[in-house]
C-alpha cells in the first residue's frame, strides 16, 4: 500500500544539509501555487541574550512548489542571526502576479563588535525579486536612536503588509516594542519604494511608549474597506492616526 498518498504535507529537499528556521509561502512564478521562501539556519539570538561570536549568518533561499531550487542569498554580518533582527515577508507588492520578498538588510561591509553585536551602521528595507533574489528597491529602515533605550530595546524589528487604501498592499517597517515605537508605511511603485507616512509614538500627546507586542496584526477592524494596524495595545488606522485603549 502506498501510504504517501495519504499525507497532508509537502516534502522538499533543501539545497544544503541544514535545518530551516522560518518559512514564508507565496506564489513566486505566477502559476497560482504557493512556493517557499526559507530562512536558514534555525539559530535564534535574542537581543537580550549574549551576542554570537562564531560569525554565523542567515541565508534566504527560494524554492518552487515542486522543490526546484531558485536562489540563495546571505544576509551577511550586518544582520544578527535572530528573529528580531531579520524580519521578512513575501507578497505580490507590485501587482504583477508574482510575489516579492520584503525584508530588513544591511550593507555587506557592516561588521559586528567584540561582543558579536551590530550597534551601528546603515540598515535597509529591501525588496527582492521572488524568482531571482535580485534587489528591486531599497530605503532606510527606521533608524536607531537613544529614544528606543539600550540595544536590547532598539533591536526590536517587525515587518508586515496592509491594504491601507483598500486595494494596494503597503509594506510596514516597524521598530520598537518596549519603549519608543515607530512604523513606516511604504508602497512599491514602478520599482521604487514611496513612503506614505511615518508614525512615531513620541509625537503623540501623551506619548505612546512600551505598548507593543511580539507581533503586528493587520486587518479591517472598522469595516471601512481599509486595513488597520494592531501593535500590542495600540492601533493605527490607514493614515497612521493613532487609537489607544480609551478610544
Which role fits each region the language model picked out?
Residues 1-247:
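Beta-propeller-forming repeat regions
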Amino acid at each position: 500500500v502506498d501510504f504517501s498518498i495519504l499525507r497532508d504535507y509537502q516534502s522538499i529537499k533543501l539545497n544544503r544539509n541544514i535545518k530551516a528556521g522560518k518559512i514564508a509561502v507565496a506564489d513566486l512564478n505566477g502559476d497560482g501555487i504557493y512556493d517557499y521562501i526559507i530562512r536558514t539556519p534555525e539559530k535564534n539570538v535574542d537581543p537580550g541574550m549574549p551576542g554570537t561570536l562564531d560569525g554565523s549568518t542567515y541565508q534566504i533561499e527560494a524554492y518552487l512548489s515542486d522543490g526546484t531550487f531558485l536562489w540563495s542569498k546571505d544576509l551577511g554580518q550586518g544582520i544578527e542571526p535572530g528573529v528580531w533582527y531579520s524580519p521578512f515577508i513575501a507578497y505580490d507588492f507590485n501587482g504583477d502576479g508574482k510575489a516579492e520578498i520584503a525584508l530588513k538588510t544591511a550593507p555587506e561591509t557592516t561588521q559586528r563588535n567584540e561582543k558579536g553585536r551590530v550597534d551601528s551602521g546603515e540598515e535597509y528595507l529591501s525588496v527582492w525579486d521572488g524568482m531571482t533574489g535580485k534587489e528591486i528597491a531599497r530605503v532606510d529602515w527606521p533608524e536607531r536612536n537613544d529614544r528606543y533605550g539600550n540595544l536590547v530595546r532598539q533591536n526590536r524589528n517587525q515587518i508586515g503588509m496592509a491594504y491601507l487604501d483598500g486595494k494596494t498592499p503597503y509594506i510596514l517597517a516597524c521598530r520598537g516594542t518596549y519603549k519608543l515605537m515607530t512604523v513606516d508605511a511604504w508602497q512599491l511603485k514602478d520599482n521604487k519604494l514611496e513612503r506614505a507616512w511615518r508614525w512615531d509614538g513620541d509625537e503623540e500627546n501623551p506619548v505612546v511608549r512600551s505598548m507593543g507586542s511580539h507581533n503586528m496584526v493587520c486587518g479591517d477592524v472598522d469595516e471601512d474597506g481599509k486595513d488597520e494596524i494592531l501593535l500590542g495595545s495600540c492601533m493605527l488606522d490607514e493614515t497612521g492616526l493613532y487609537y489607544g485603549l480609551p478610544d
